[in-house]
């Protein structure tokens, strides 16, 4: 089943609560893909980075930006990334931030290497690291870093089987070193396709898959005391799922989609971190197509002076191809004088790509208002 036709959200328009929209940035769209990284990159009006991923022909080594201010797709003219999908993507906390990747898979198998982008020359480097790295694995997340460190738990081995590893691995991007700190309490069982989300000093792990078992449990570890806690959440607790997406905004964690025992999912939940309560979010039709192995992030959305005009469904106009001058250069740019002011800002969940259980690869860019 192909993507359902969602209303188009035009630049500057005010989205309505409880609705899904599609975005149609100008320029040359990236190919549909699964297992890609997805990050919001601050600076100016902000940009969304899509990195790597795969389709049935193989793994990708490309990167693309959505320029939110210009509403434009722009390829990043970088080189040297080893093709990979279902990898970890993260920005370190140093200034300026640096873009890193870890793990993932390609046609020949899983990876355990890290790479970092040199933003001055646009080249991916493979630094020498010390310590014991994790076993090669898939580990699909863009939200598992705290400060300058990436936290790795679980991941995929082969097929539906996870790596048999319940150790927490920490990669320090400053020291270029892997460590395995001692933890307390019972860790989650081995799994892959789970979401890993950093909130302050805490890591939350939800769901995942091992063989034919779909998990619906929620764990937390505070990196200040390294104690695992299984959370007895309340409310509309989501059923077991894997390969779903996640994002955090203020005091809520959001998840969308994934796959469960009965197939792909098109539901969205939010989890109140302090109250430990799940809520199933309700949306008007049409809903996005259910999907797995997609990626999601939170973006700011500027509502213009005429922003109360409703977003409408219409046929997209033919879009021009991005010129060489539109190609993304530096990762983070300086503040734009026309950057959004606080009173005109809203925030959206943005999702790109994914697939269904019939191996249809999605190429859509969909958004929904965070209330």
Curated annotation (Swiss-Prot):
It comes from the Eukaryota. Gene3D superfamilies: Kelch-type beta propeller (2.120.10.80). Keywords: Kelch repeat, Repeat. Kelch repeats lie at residues 47-93, 98-144, 149-201, 202-251, 252-301, 348-371. InterPro entries: Kelch-typ_b-propeller, Kelch_1, Rab9_kelch_effector. Rab9 effector required for endosome to trans-Golgi network (TGN) transport. This is Rab9 effector protein with kelch motifs. It comes from Gallus gallus (Chicken). The gene is RABEPK.
């Amino acid at each position: 089943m192909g993507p359902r036709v969602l209303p188009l959200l035009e630049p500057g328009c005010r989205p309505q609560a409880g609705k899904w929209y599609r975005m149609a940035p100008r320029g040359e769209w990236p190919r549909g893909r699964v297992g890609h990284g997805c990050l919001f990159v601050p600076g100016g009006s902000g940009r969304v980075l899509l990195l790597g991923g795969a389709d049935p022909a193989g793994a990708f080594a490309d990167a693309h930006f959505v320029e939110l201010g210009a509403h434009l797709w722009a390829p990043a003219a970088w080189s040297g990334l080893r093709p990979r999908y279902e990898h970890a993507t993260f920005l370190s906390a140093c200034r300026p931030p640096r873009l890193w990747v870890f793990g993932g898979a390609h046609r020949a198998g899983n990876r355990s290497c890290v790479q970092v982008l040199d933003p001055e020359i646009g080249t991916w480097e493979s630094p020498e690291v010390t310590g014991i790295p994790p076993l090669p694995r898939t580990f699909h997340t863009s939200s598992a870093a705290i400060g300058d460190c990436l936290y790795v738990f679980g991941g995929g081995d082969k097929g539906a089987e996870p790596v048999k590893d319940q150790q927490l691995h920490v990669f320090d991007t400053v020291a270029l070193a892997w460590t395995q700190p001692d933890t307390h309490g019972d860790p989650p069982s081995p799994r892959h396709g789970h979401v890993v989300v950093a909130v302050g000093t805490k890591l939350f792990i939800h769901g995942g898959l091992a063989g034919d078992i779909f998990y619906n449990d929620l764990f937390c570890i505070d990196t200040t005391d390294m104690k695992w806690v299984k959370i007895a959440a309340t409310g509309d607790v989501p059923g077991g799922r894997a390969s779903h997406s996640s994002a955090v905004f203020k005091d809520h964690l959001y998840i969308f989609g994934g796959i469960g025992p009965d197939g792909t999912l098109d539901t969205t939940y939010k989890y109140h971190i302090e109250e430990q309560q799940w809520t199933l979010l309700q949306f008007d039709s049409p809903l996005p197509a259910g999907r797995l192995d997609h990626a999601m992030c939170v973006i700011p959305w500027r509502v213009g002076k005429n922003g109360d005009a409703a977003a409408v469904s219409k046929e997209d106009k033919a879009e021009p191809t991005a010129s060489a001058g539109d190609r993304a250069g530096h990762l983070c740019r300086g503040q734009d004088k026309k950057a959004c002011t606080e009173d005109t800002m809203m925030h959206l969940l943005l999702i790109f790509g994914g697939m269904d259980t019939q191996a249809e690869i999605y190429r859509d860019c969909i958004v929904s208002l965070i209330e």
